[in-house]
């Protein structure tokens, strides 16, 4: 019988793993708690949820493209939607791969205009090699969801980070609700994590679809820029007020360096 405590430990570690490190965490967990624990349905669900939480981009083999997944782009039957490619699919719990891909004809003119505006914004302001997005028309809730996912990894230099934003436009009232999460992880001779989660409310009200789309993307841009500016202030403050005082006042030997050049004549040695 599988120890429930080991299952809970595995789930917790998976949930807390920084972006870019899940593969190594799973490898370590298998060696510690064993394959039987990792094969439990609850553990596999946690791995699946990790992908949704971090707005991961999965490979859609049908369209040969990558699409961001989220609970917000999943319908009541468990299909994730990539309306830009007119396809929906499920992800196997065991395999983690795209399964049961089907064509879909759910389209919305406003969604299409928003997708084009979002693409233009991202191409201008983001590094597209690490950026993925998805624009989804939720027919049942009468809303449009915009997902922006950036996973920026430099494991050789001991850091990884992600910038995840979710925006929901109510089609009827044109109200906008947004959530932005930024997580960074530095682990060279230490373990420093920074996690930010902030919310926004606004409006994209306008005349035609083009104006609504432009207003929505402008709201996204303004909101994201405000977070970026605040982060720059935070990092400056951390460096000056908190990081510098932690640095060693003396070298490891406990002896101050003599910087008098007259006493450092190497020619006499």
Regions found by a protein language model. Name each.
Residues 150-162, 217-222, 261-264:
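Short, Lys/Arg-enriched charge-dense amphipathic segments
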Residues 6, 79, 89, 158, ...:
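Phenylalanine-focused residue identity feature
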Residues 1-140, 232, 236, 240-269:
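A structural "domain/chain start" motif
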Residues 189-236:
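Short secondary-structure boundary motifs at beta->alpha junctions and helix caps
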């Amino acid at each position: 019988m599988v120890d429930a405590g080991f299952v809970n430990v595995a789930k917790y570690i998976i949930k807390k793993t920084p972006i870019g490190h899940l593969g190594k965490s799973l490898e370590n967990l298998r060696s510690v708690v064993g394959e039987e624990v990792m094969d439990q349905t609850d553990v596999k669900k946690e791995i699946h949820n990790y992908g949704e939480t971090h707005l991961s981009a999965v490979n859609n083999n049908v369209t040969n493209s990558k699409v961001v997944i989220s609970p917000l782009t999943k319908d009541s039957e468990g299909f994730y939607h990539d309306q830009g490619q007119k396809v929906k699919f499920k992800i196997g719990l065991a395999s983690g791969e795209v399964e049961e891909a089907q064509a879909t004809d759910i389209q919305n003119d406003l969604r299409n205009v928003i997708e084009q505006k979002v693409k233009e914004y991202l191409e201008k302001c983001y590094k597209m090699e690490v950026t993925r997005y998805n624009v989804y028309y939720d027919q049942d809730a009468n809303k449009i969801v915009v997902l922006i996912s950036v996973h920026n990894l430099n494991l050789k230099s001991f850091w990884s980070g992600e910038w995840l934003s979710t925006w929901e436009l109510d089609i009827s009232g044109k109200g906008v609700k947004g959530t932005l999460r930024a997580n960074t992880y530095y682990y060279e001779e230490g373990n420093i994590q920074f996690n930010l989660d902030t919310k926004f409310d606004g409006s994209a009200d306008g005349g035609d679809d083009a104006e609504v789309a432009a207003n929505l993307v402008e709201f996204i841009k303004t909101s994201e820029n405000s977070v970026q500016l605040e982060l720059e202030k935070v990092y400056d403050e951390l460096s000056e007020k908190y990081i510098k005082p932690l640095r060693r006042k003396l070298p490891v030997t406990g002896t101050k360096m003599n910087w008098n050049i007259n006493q450092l004549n190497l020619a006499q040695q």
